[in-house]
Amino acid sequence: VATPAMPSMTDAQVAAVKGDWEKIKGSGVEILYFFLNKFPGNFPMFKKLGNDLAAAKGTAEFKDQADKIIAFLQGVIEKLGSDMGGAKALLNQLGTSHKAMGITKDQFDQFRQALTELLGNLGFGGNIGAWNATVDLMFHVIFNALDGTPV
């Protein structure tokens, strides 16, 4: 998976993503479950969740992991359009920590595929261009960190 170029996001794109985010940020368990169900090869990376995805979904550990993902995305999305330095710091930190865990660009790309599909399923397909720009921005920074060259 190639590292995407750093996009320039318009104010309208930022507003669209932030508006959608307000409507879906409470869906962390569903987002994580959709990703892991679509790409089950990633489930073993979440060792504390056990061996059965369906059984794990209702556990406190699953909700805790989903909440961590949502909190991270919240931190980045709230900085869009106003604090790129802060967003990059969060993204570099995530890339560095996930490199240490052996997470690959392919696995991040699988998360993108699942998120894009889920956004469409939830009725947010009209803003998919804005979401793609947001994910390109995130992956530009994360992938550089995975490559050992944080930006």
Swiss-Prot record:
Transmembrane segments: none annotated. Heme b binds at H98. Gene3D superfamilies: Globins (1.10.490.10). PROSITE patterns: GLOBIN (PS01033). CDD domains: Mb-like. Belongs to the globin family. Signal peptide: none annotated. Residues 8-147 form the Globin domain. Keywords: Heme, Iron, Metal-binding, Oxygen transport, Transport. InterPro entries: Erythrocruorin, Globin, Globin-like_sf, Globin/Proto, Mb-like_M. There are at least 12 different components in Midge globin. Monomer. It comes from Chironomus thummi thummi. SUPFAM superfamilies: Globin-like. GO terms for cellular component: extracellular region; hemoglobin complex. One of its GO terms (molecular function) is oxygen carrier activity. This is Globin CTT-IIIA.
